[in-house]
Swiss-Prot record:
The gene is rpsH. Belongs to the universal ribosomal protein uS8 family. InterPro entries: Ribosomal_uS8, Ribosomal_uS8_CS, Ribosomal_uS8_sf. Pfam families: Ribosomal_S8. Transmembrane segments: none annotated. GO terms for molecular function: rRNA binding; structural constituent of ribosome. One of the primary rRNA binding proteins, it binds directly to 16S rRNA central domain where it helps coordinate assembly of the platform of the 30S subunit. GO terms for cellular component: ribonucleoprotein complex; ribosome. This is Small ribosomal subunit protein uS8.
C-alpha cells in the first residue's frame, strides 16, 4: 500500500487511538516517525516507544500513549506542513503554540526538534506539526 503522507498517518493514528482510550498504537516504522515519537516522549506527551522487527525486513513502531485522570495528555495534534504545501520558517519566524503551552515539531538541518530547541540552536526549518 502506498502512503503519500506518513507523518499525517502517524498523527492521525495517535489522535484516533487517544480518542477511544487505547493504551498503544502500532504502525509501520520509519526514521522520521521514530524521531517525531522521540520528541513526543521527551516532551512528556507519550509514555514510551518501541521499534520491533517484523517479517520481510520491516520494522514496527509501537507508541504507548499517556493519560492523566482518564483523559489523553495530547489534546491537539495537527499537521501543519503537508506534502502539497510545505511550510518553512526561519529561526525568527518559528511559531509558538498556545503561547508556549504546546510545541511545534520542526524538521531542521540538525534533526527533528521542538520549536524551543530550534530557537535555542538558531536554526529554522519545516514546521511539521503542532502538539498541545
Amino acid at each position: 500500500m502506498s502512503m503519500t503522507d506518513p507523518i499525517a498517518d502517524l498523527l492521525v493514528r495517535i489522535k484516533n487511538a487517544a480518542a477511544v482510550g487505547k493504551p498503544t498504537v502500532k504502525l509501520p516504522s520509519s526514521k522520521i516517525k521514530v524521531a517525531i515519537a522521540q520528541v513526543l516522549k521527551d516532551e512528556g506527551y507519550i509514555t514510551d516507544l518501541r521499534v520491533t522487527a517484523t517479517e520481510n525486513n520491516k520494522s514496527e513502531l509501537e507508541i504507548v500513549l499517556k493519560y492523566f485522570e482518564g483523559r489523553p495528555v495530547i489534546e491537539t495534534l495537527k499537521r501543519f506542513s503537508r506534502s502539497g504545501l510545505r511550510q518553512y520558517r526561519g529561526k525568527t519566524e518559528l511559531p509558538k503554540v498556545l503561547g508556549g503551552l504546546g510545541i511545534a515539531i520542526i524538521s531542521t538541518s540538525k534533526g527533528i526538534m521542538t520549536d524551543a530547541q530550534a530557537r535555542e540552536a538558531g536554526v529554522g526549518g519545516e514546521v511539521l506539526c503542532f502538539v498541545a
